[in-house]
Amino acid sequence: MLFRTFKSLMIALVFGAITASAQDFDPIASRRLTEYQMPATTQTHEFARVPDTNIVLLSQMSNSNLVKIELDPTTEEPIALHSFPMGKDSDSGLHGVWPSTVYPGKVWLSLQLENKLLLVDPGKESWIAPTILQTIDIPAPGNGPHCVFEIGNRIWAGLKEESEQTGKYYVFSADVSDPTDHTLYECLKSPVFIKEEPTTGLIYVTQDTDSSIMRIDVTSGETEQLPIPPSVGNTAVGMITAYGPMSGVWFTLAGNATGGTGTFGHIGSSGEIEFFQLRHPLGANSGLLHLADATTEDGGPALWILSTSLLSNDSPDALIHVTFDPDVTSVADEEYISMLTQHSKVHRVVPLGSTVLVSELSTFTLAQLSYSNTVAGQWLPAESVSDSAVYAEAS
């Protein structure tokens, strides 16, 4: 009896010690980057999540296929995919993908080499083929819709191909419900992203080759060019509209064959360009291609920015989380996530609910970044572990 009592006491003490020991441990912070292989092709471009669904649509331009990707509803991990040809043949040049707000659940696509825009019903399941609901032919002299966007009740597209009639480049805009109500704005070579400044309602367009941003007053029809100073950088590409403390349009400079300058910019209601530059040596030669708003209530104003090897192998393929001071006048901190496959020419970044997706143009891959027991912007920089400031921050 005494032995049994002693044995029970020892078991209780050991179990209690294990429980107490387990409770003393803090959860381990981790971040994970996972690559998901898409159907093999040479150019994997744009993608977007269909709102209120677990479906992501991804364009592959080199074979004009639309990949429908199903996400796990809890983890957001890709779990299934099906690919569908779009256009008359594999040379139709599927590129732009943009969810419609006017037509909820529907998505705009661009066929760059067919000179068309499509409104499609993607279907609620990954194996269901998209249904074309509307086709908009780009009128002459416009040619080659690249990226497509819906702003208010109008559809916009940057026409990236040189006009066969005039040798010039244009931005296309049309009423969503009446495409015959359209306008072509002459621009420089060549328009990519088109966004609205939320306070003024002015439209801004990045033009990559001629490294300038065009401003459009849709009321008067007047346009104005805002050249990028060569001393700052070149090749304006990515652009987003942001609200709240980040209000305005933000854009990136992708650099050239020798790399980039780690520079991005902001245009607010004043219409003036304010440039920002990455401070960390890792970003010094980065060509910045695309970006997304990463602002959170707890973390404050922030951006996700893609550094890409698209124009130069001297520019790393990386996803960068940039935070700002409360007034958004200077960069406060940077977190670098090097892509697993370098020289993959990372192309677009799209935040989901709790994870972030990145497309890799030349390796038919979709990468996903996820965090556990921490959040973006709180990861301590590995390259500074010997810095006393890091120990102070971690303590």
Language model features with spans:
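Fungal secretory targeting signals
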Residues: 1-22
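Structural motif
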Residues: 65-69, 115-121, 164-173, 211-215, ...
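A short helix->beta-strand "capping" segment at the edge of beta-propeller domains
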Residues: 23-42
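Conserved beta-strand positions in repeat-built beta-propeller and related beta-rich domains
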Residues: 50, 57-62, 101, 108-114, ...
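Beta-rich, blade/repeat-based domains predominating
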Residues: 39-52, 87-103, 139-152, 158-161, ...
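A short beta-strand motif characteristic of beta-propeller blades
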Residues: 32-38, 79-87, 129-138, 180-186, ...
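Blade-level signature of beta-propeller repeat domains, shared across WD40, Kelch, NHL, RCC1
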Residues: 320, 338, 347-395
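Short loop/turn segments that connect beta-strands within beta-propeller blades
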Residues: 70-75, 121-126, 174-179, 217-221, ...
